[in-house]
Amino acid sequence: MIEADRLIQPQDLGQEDVIDRAMRPKLLDEYTGQDDTRAQLKVFIEAAKKRGEALDHMLIYGPPGLGKTTLANIVANEMGVNIKSTSGPVLEKAGDLAALLTNLEEGDVLFIDEIHRLSPVVEEILYPAMEDYQLDIMIGEGPAARSIKLDLPPFTLVGATTRAGSLTSPLRARFGIPLRLEFYNVRDLSSIVARSAKVMDVPMDEGGAEEIARRSRGTPRIANRLLRRVRDFAEVKHDGAISRAVAQSALDLLDVDSEGFDYMDRKLLLAIIDKFMGGPVGLDNLAAAIGEERETIEDVLEPFLIQQGFVQRTPRGRIATARAYSHFDLIKPD
């Protein structure tokens, strides 16, 4: 499996969630990027508040590290309600979910991260809860067992997933508001880096923010992580201020190149170019060649490489594009 301490991996590393919490926007007006999603949410939230109703159930999906948890908390703040957070793997038994549902107050947000990993038993409990605000529970065992219905207050379920295609059709159909998060552009990510630096009281100019953003793979979580490491470098090697030159030196030292690639990205690209003559190469062969799992390539390595035009996914397999060759100062054969 991929190394857990990979600097540019989009998943949370240990205590990062606690550290990042202080840097997260609390309201939609503070939220940068994802313009279409933000505009839609603003309308949906305002409409629900005008009607005095709970917001419709919402599914937020997209690559990791783009702010799904942040958006769920913003929704709760904008609606003026509480949020209870959990994740799919934690909800092992129907009783685990029932305990959460019965403690919700009217309008509250229940946030389930990695919702695609819910067990079928737990998912069955969700259906009537989402549709009718009712909880079906079994009392007793064997022939004497009976089902009773408990009424639940209207609530908003916010599900987050990196694998929307893995959700069952019945569950996916019950979300009235599907929102896809995209990778951030450099301009929006620069604004996020600048905001985080201000929260951290780190002096930084526009060039420094842009350089960190440019190497952050379009992902706020990675940008904030790189900002913390560049801050360390600036404090020890310089006067504490982050300029473009300081950011470049620090990130070069950390082996994060100008495109935001580390050794794993370069390993994947070079495997396609050198071992498979540029492709096409099947996913299983590529996974074996670089010593990684299929899921790691599909969920972690590939999305950004494809989105940035370095890898093309075809029915016959993965192909390295001319841009991938150019990154290594190579010329793609005709």
Curated annotation (Swiss-Prot):
The keyword ATP-binding applies. One of its GO terms (biological process) is DNA repair. Its main location: cytoplasm. ATP binds at residues 24, 65, 68-70, 131-133, 174, 184, 221. Residues 4-184 are annotated as: Large ATPase domain (RuvB-L). Has 3 domains, the large (RuvB-L) and small ATPase (RuvB-S) domains and the C-terminal head (RuvB-H) domain. The head domain binds DNA, while the ATPase domains jointly bind ATP, ADP or are empty depending on the state of the subunit in the translocation cycle. During a single DNA translocation step the structure of each domain remains the same, but their relative positions change. It holds the Pfam family AAA_lid_4. It is found in: Cytoplasm. DNA binds at residues 294, 313, 318. Mg(2+) binds at residue 69. Its EC number is 3.6.4.-. The gene is ruvB. Residues 258-334 are annotated as: Head domain (RuvB-H). GO terms for cellular component: cytoplasm; Holliday junction resolvase complex. One of its GO terms (molecular function) is ATP hydrolysis activity. SUPFAM superfamilies: P-loop containing nucleoside triphosphate hydrolases, Winged helix' DNA-binding domain. Residues 185-255 are annotated as: Small ATPAse domain (RuvB-S). It catalyses: ATP + H2O = ADP + phosphate + H(+). Gene3D superfamilies: 1.10.8.60, P-loop containing nucleotide triphosphate hydrolases (3.40.50.300), Winged helix-like DNA-binding domain superfamily/Winged helix DNA-binding domain (1.10.10.10). This is Holliday junction branch migration complex subunit RuvB. The RuvA-RuvB-RuvC complex processes Holliday junction (HJ) DNA during genetic recombination and DNA repair, while the RuvA-RuvB complex plays an important role in the rescue of blocked DNA replication forks via replication fork reversal (RFR). RuvA specifically binds to HJ cruciform DNA, conferring on it an open structure. The RuvB hexamer acts as an ATP-dependent pump, pulling dsDNA into and through the RuvAB complex. RuvB forms 2 homohexamers on either side of HJ DNA bound by 1 or 2 RuvA tetramers; 4 subunits per hexamer contact DNA at a time. Keywords: ATP-binding, Cytoplasm, DNA damage, DNA recombination, DNA repair, DNA-binding, Hydrolase, Nucleotide-binding. It is an enzyme of class 3 (hydrolase). Homohexamer. Forms an RuvA(8)-RuvB(12)-Holliday junction (HJ) complex. HJ DNA is sandwiched between 2 RuvA tetramers; dsDNA enters through RuvA and exits via RuvB. An RuvB hexamer assembles on each DNA strand where it exits the tetramer. Each RuvB hexamer is contacted by two RuvA subunits (via domain III) on 2 adjacent RuvB subunits; this complex drives branch migration. In the full resolvosome a probable DNA-RuvA(4)-RuvB(12)-RuvC(2) complex forms which resolves the HJ. Belongs to the RuvB family.
